[in-house]
């Protein structure tokens, strides 16, 4: 099973020490309520070997290189274990000569977002809805002091720990299996990321308030979410599904989203990027058996979802507390 005690030791001597008032008991409850597959996934992490690493690159990729090349048999055993943790959604990872080609080219998003950010060097960072942690490792590559990701999905936790093990057990990033609504307001993070979360929230303004409560005064929010065209009054509320997703509630226009952030008390709100999701960025691979973007779009008109809504378009908004 995954041991959170090293994380407790890390935060005991950091600005996050007050989190120890609630976090250990929360995770103890979580461990009693885990999904039936969790024990199997955690064992797969245990089965992965400890490998000597010659070089780790988190600046331009998430990549580890072995001291000596792995044999074909060693590679195949690792691939077998990693494929037991499918589907791999956010990546890619290059681990000891193994290319984990995930559904999403999350490096595309990172390349769009990074140039606009306040430098991450020596920052304490929270990544909300972090998935398997790809962007967390890229934040570490930019010199972050510590990156904490939160995501309640047990598979993502096990994928993260598998990658960590193949990155020489790097402790600068940690994934905690909670939702932001379960976090006590800490108010200490220099940068808070929420990417691909807001449209899944029934109450988007509550989510913005929760993000603000984790930031220090002057800290930076990085918000990436689905948007639609329109003025400051326009919000798309899908009837049943959007791109085959049942849990999409509100897709605002960029001016509307800026208004929400200002209404929530953020300052210096600005949109730095808007991009239609491409079939190169989200696609099927051998590491994903499920459907992907091509299956969610109108086969005769890729500017629309299969339900007839505008195809996914994402904006990056920055703001300060």
Swiss-Prot record:
Carboxy-S-adenosyl-L-methionine binds at residues 90, 104, 109, 129, 151-153, 180-181, 195, 199, 314. The keyword Lipid biosynthesis does not apply. InterPro entries: CmoB, Mo5U34_MeTrfas-like, SAM-dependent_MTases_sf. Its EC number is 2.5.1.-. Keywords: Transferase, tRNA processing. Pfam families: Methyltransf_9. It catalyses: carboxy-S-adenosyl-L-methionine + 5-hydroxyuridine(34) in tRNA = 5-carboxymethoxyuridine(34) in tRNA + S-adenosyl-L-homocysteine + H(+). It is an enzyme of class 2 (transferase). GO terms for biological process: tRNA wobble uridine modification. GO terms for molecular function: methyltransferase activity; transferase activity, transferring alkyl or aryl (other than methyl) groups. CDD domains: AdoMet_MTases. The keyword Membrane does not apply. Catalyzes carboxymethyl transfer from carboxy-S-adenosyl-L-methionine (Cx-SAM) to 5-hydroxyuridine (ho5U) to form 5-carboxymethoxyuridine (cmo5U) at position 34 in tRNAs. Homotetramer. Belongs to the class I-like SAM-binding methyltransferase superfamily. CmoB family. This is tRNA U34 carboxymethyltransferase.
């Amino acid at each position: 099973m995954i041991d959170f005690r090293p994380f407790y030791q890390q935060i005991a001597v950091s600005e996050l020490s007050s989190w120890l008032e609630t976090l250990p008991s929360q995770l103890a409850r979580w461990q009693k309520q885990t999904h039936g597959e969790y024990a199997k996934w955690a064992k797969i992490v245990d089965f992965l070997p400890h490998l000597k690493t010659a070089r780790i690159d988190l600046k331009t990729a998430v990549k580890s290189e072995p001291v000596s090349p792995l044999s074909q048999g060693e590679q195949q055993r690792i691939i077998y274990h990693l494929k037991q943790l499918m589907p791999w959604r956010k990546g890619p990872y290059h681990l000891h000569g193994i290319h984990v080609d995930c559904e999403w080219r999350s490096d595309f998003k990172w390349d769009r977002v990074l140039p606009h950010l306040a430098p991450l060097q020596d920052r304490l960072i929270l990544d909300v809805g972090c998935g398997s942690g790809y962007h967390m490792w890229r934040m570490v590559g930019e010199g972050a002091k510590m990156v904490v990701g939160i995501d309640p999905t047990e598979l993502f936790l096990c994928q993260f720990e598998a990658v960590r093990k193949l990155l020489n057990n790097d402790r600068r990033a940690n994934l905690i299996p909670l939702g932001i609504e379960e976090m006590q307001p800490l108010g200490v993070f220099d940068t808070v990321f929420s990417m691909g979360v807001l449209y899944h929230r029934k109450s988007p303004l509550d989510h913005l308030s929760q993000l603000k409560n984790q930031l220090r005064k002057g800290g930076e929010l990085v918000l990436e979410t689905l948007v639609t065209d329109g003025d400051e009054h326009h919000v798309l509320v899908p009837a049943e599904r959007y791109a085959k997703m049942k849990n999409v509630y509100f897709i605002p226009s960029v001016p509307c989203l800026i208004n929400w952030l200002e209404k929530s008390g953020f300052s210096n709100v600005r949109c730095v990027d808007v991009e239609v999701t491409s079939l190169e960025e989200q696609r099927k691979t051998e590491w994903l058996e499920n459907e992907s973007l091509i299956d969610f779009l109108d086969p005769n008109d890729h500017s629309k979802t299969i339900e007839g809504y505008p195809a996914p378009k994402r904006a990056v908004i920055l703001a300060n507390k």
